[in-house]
Amino acid sequence: MAGVRRVDAHQHFWRLDRGDYAWLTPDLAPIYRDFGPGDLAPLLAQTGVGETVLVQAAPTVAETRFLLEVASTTPFVSGVVGWAPLDAPDAADVVATLAEHPALKGLRPMLQDIEDPDWMLRPPVGQGLRTVEAFGLAFDALVRPAHLRNLRRLLASHPGLRVVVDHGAKPEIAAGRFGRWAADIRGLAEETRAWVKLSGLVTEAGPDWSVERLRPYVEHLLEYFGPHRLIFGSDWPVVTLRAGYAEWLAAAETLLAGLEGEARARIMGLNAVEVYRL
């Protein structure tokens, strides 16, 4: 479909000397270096992706400010999903200050790294999420399968919150686990209005990933979320631990090949425009 916006709804930039990326260690050699707009621009040009959503990779307000500065000087970055201390007494003030920047489109606590799986259900977090909703921001849920039942409980209390589940909730593809994830994903789709990102799956599938290994997971997401609630993202540069940018994009397009053009266009860009108000 000519003229349709193609959006990568999940990519990162970082600069190691900032010092706030605790998860990014030398053993992750392919991505243990700085990544910026100059690294991604040729990949976007090669693949015909016109714009991106830049997502936080450190649980600090300072990193979010850094990303907003990058967005201000990078034409292809249409929005930023940042971080704020949603359980802090001053959360509303922090969110209000960050939201003054027009590029801020959402916030993402790094739920997968928080030791207490019930953290998201704490009353101060609920108040923080009401602030997110009040400022018209999306909430990115970086969760694993074990978080999905709590996430369903959380969203029942926040029916108006625009929620995007990152990386298909990280199914354990390499281990061949499907059943519990599939049941909880179905419940999430049926009980909430959440969107889910078609991203990060090659990382979860391991070094011997293939389109066919991903297919049952993608088909399950499509069956229950449908093309109106599925959003493409690259998870670049993390994806390069398993596949190149163009390689993952081609795999995603292969997995979506059975859909009509309008449905593919929604997944490959229009849904991101809607949920992040790009």
Give, region by region, the residue ranges found by the protein language model:
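Catalytic pocket-lining loop regions of alpha/beta-barrel enzymes
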Residues: 119-231
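Mid-domain alpha/beta scaffold segments of enzyme catalytic cores
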Residues: 1-135, 141, 188, 212
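Short, small-residue-enriched loops and turns at beta-alpha junctions
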Residues: 59-60, 86-89, 114-118, 171-174, ...
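Active-site metal-binding loops of divalent metal-dependent hydrolases
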Residues: 11, 57, 168, 235-236
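Mid-to-C-terminal alpha-helical segments outside catalytic/metal-binding sites
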Residues: 2-7, 31-51, 220, 225-231, ...
